[in-house]
Each structure stands twice: as C-alpha cells, then as structure tokens.
Amino acid sequence: KKDEEHSLYIRPFIFASGECIKASASDEYTFMIITSPTTRYYPSDINVLVEQHYTRAAKGGVGYTKASGNYASSFYPTKLANARGFTQVIWTDAVEHKYIEESGTMNIWIRINDTLITPELNDSILGGFTRDSLITLARENGIKVEERKISVDEIIEAYNNGILKEVFGTGTAVTVAPIHSITVGDKKIEIESQINSYASKLKKTLQGIQNGSIKDVYGWTSKVNSVVSSH
C-alpha cells in the first residue's frame, strides 16, 4: 500500500572495528546497512531556535560529512532548546554566529518574495541529497533558487517587511518539513501557512517520484524486485 508519510528508511554506515584501543585510525572497518520503517519525522509543528552561542561544526572540520561525531556537539544545545519547547535548533556559522547553516536533521530553505534561498555549501554544512533534488525540481518548475549566504538579520528584515513567505527544512528522513516559527534571542518570528506553498508543491512532486506515481525522468529511483530466500 502506498502511503506518502510512511517509508522504509535505509541507512548504510561504516565503523572502525580493529582489535585495538588507541587514538589513531583503525586498520579495519565494518560496513553495514540497517533498515527501519518510518513515518512522519516531526508529527507536530516545527518551532526552531537560532543557536548563536554553541557550534555544531567549524571551518576546516568535517561538518560536511555524515559522521557520527558531528552529532555529539549538537546534543547538549539541542537538549537545552527542547527544554524550552523548541523542536530543533538552526545552527549558525562558528566565527560570527551571523549566517545560518543547517538544522539538526535538515538543510534550511528561506522563501523571500518568490525566491528560494538555501545556504551555499561549505565544510561545515552537510550537502543533502534531498537538498539537491529540490534545487532541481524547483528550477524546473520555474522557481528562482539562490545558493548563497543568508544572515539572521536578513531573515528578520524580510519578516519585518512582510516578504518572508516560507521557511522549511529538507532531509532524507523529514523529506520536506515546513517550519512554523523561528526564535532569535527574545524575538519570535511566526510564519503563516501558505495555501500554495513551495514546500507543499515540491514535497508532493518529490514523494510522487519516490512512490512511482510521478515518472522519474532524473534517474533518482531504482526498482527493487522481491527476493525469495532459498533457505
């Protein structure tokens, strides 16, 4: 049965498994794949806090990789944000805490007027596959997309001028997830839902390609045939 909010999550991973304990690279690694049925990642409204003190990843590090160590630095500040009622945090750059980078599980998208803006990739931002897919889908649907730095101040200014239309996140698990509010310090920015939002339009197209109801002209999907074990 096709269900747009349910899927099988597939996660390949690799870990050091050498028979030694020392502060050095291992000479042996184990590769595994785990799967899990999943449903909507965030079941309720997403309200985020812009983090301007703690840092997820710094320039020159490995923030652009899917490394487990990158999550460790995010746990404590995220726990503090959760205790205040926030769903997630939006990380800012490690130097000035001025430019937004990503959220805990998502790449971030800002719609100002009719332009979609997503932070340009650097060595502290993980470049997600869903992010790449949405850039392609948005541009093919005539939506202007900019990959560039975007500051917290620019978002606040757009909100004050009434031209901040949407904020949403993208990721393998979340797909496309609208963000309902952003808090910067003591200022809360509430984003009104759009009837024909870019987020809902792009999510519908992406999920249609994933479940086969929309033809995949990009070669993003592969058919997996049933395998019957002989044992």
Task: Label every model-predicted segment.
Residues 13, 20-231:
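Helix-start/capping segments and mature chain N-termini
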Residues 2-19:
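Short, glycine/charge-rich beta-strand/loop segments that flank catalytic centers
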